[in-house]
């Protein structure tokens, strides 16, 4: 059975089962990777899942085994990539988790002292081990308490930037007291049903929580403009898109839940703070009532005191310190350890976020949820938010979330247009991944295209000719198709790419294209990049201005100083831009600054 014969011979030596596709993998293929017990307990559902993929012309291998380490799996994936044009894989059940160290320069925000902090906490769970074949790692050992965790240093002679060869997703059951194999069976049945829908991406919600983007309205409102560029026409119709912000309600949690429960909702993106067990939806509401504000402060003091007690700290000493600092008396701390006040404060706190226990009753229906947040996708945990979403009884089938903390000053909407054009989630993620980002759920899920003549999945898996992408760059009216063309030409080191990127930045009407040009030029770090930065500080798109000022500060070239000062004088109402201006000015001697 084609390449499967050779692989099958290898598999028995390792105690593995490999089932070759029923279709010959000519243009592309996919791998369903599972552990032996999950294969035995969920075989009908896994085979049904494979069948629906093959109906979509995606031949799928099944790789089942008692995996001893991540290298076993990676070797098979690399072989399928060479022999059968593998485009991606999904990990179902108990699949080894690479815990990456010495790679914090490749994360967007995660920084922790690897010498002083516990190894479990200071490592990044990352499936880039599996899907970026060029990365090299030095094996450190298996975790002593969790058999799934394997620690690696990023090797000194490894590439120090990501460029994924395939995509991956994880379907890892929760340890929440329910049968883990029934979770997988139910999920795969839901995923198969989702594949059989003819569902166009035309119902979208964005929610921005308290603290995101420094609560800047200027930064928040730009997302609406960007999405209209990426999905032209889709959101011009009434009620197809909704942009929600924490400040629209005192307690927005119920509004968010109502959105998640919509039967017709295709996609929801959260911009918020997070932990594995919680989404921080909002904070204490603003008030002009002194008595109400006083009660909010007392609740905060009670909460902080409980934290001190939980950590076996000096409660009396902390109260004395606060009384001195804030000129308070001890009545401000009254009830901190009273059961009735603890109950009341807990109820009040529950209004501010979505926690693990909330998700089953919410039963989210949004087919695809993006968590632009820290830790919501931390799959090393026994239970975590993104996992709860996909294993719920609702119609949510896939999430995109981060395993550690993540930077706010990054583009969260890259290449969204490809999702609307019917691209598999995994193929989209392959070009937007960072070290900590992961697909939780089925990476082959896609929306229907709704546009004649657009075969994005084939384009991304088979079209490597520069001529193809040059034609798309020249002729396509769609901003994100132009973006992908620029990215492909950049990766292929197309002659003159730097000048092409600068020209496109100077002439494109699309903010998303201009940002792509600037970010790719940053990797080249040439004179064109510096000239584009000077133009970028007055771009209509706030995010471009924000990032341009930040990069000027990192470079610290004297030629940038007049542009930074001009921005300080003229763009002071853009909070995030202004913050970056003040930070950038620290790179310059005070004697050079004249305002």
Q: Across the structure, where does each feature detected by a protein language model lie?
A:
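Structural detector for internal amphipathic alpha-helices that build alpha-solenoid repeat scaffolds
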Residues: 458, 480-493, 512-525, 545-557, ...
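Catalytic cores of nucleophile-dependent amide-cleaving enzymes
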Residues: 123-186, 295-411
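Loop/turn elements at helix/coil->beta-strand transitions in domains of secreted/extracellular proteins
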Residues: 27-29, 56-60, 84-88, 199-204, ...
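Bacterial Sec-dependent N-terminal signal peptides
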Residues: 1-16
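Structured catalytic cores of large enzymes
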Residues: 7, 71-250, 259-267, 276, ...
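Conserved small/polar residues in nucleotide/adenosyl-binding loops
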Residues: 593-595
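Short inter-helical turns and helix N-cap capping residues of alpha-solenoid HEAT/ARM repeat scaffolds
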Residues: 477-478, 509-510, 540-541, 572-574
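Caspase-like cysteine protease fold
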Residues: 412-496, 512-515
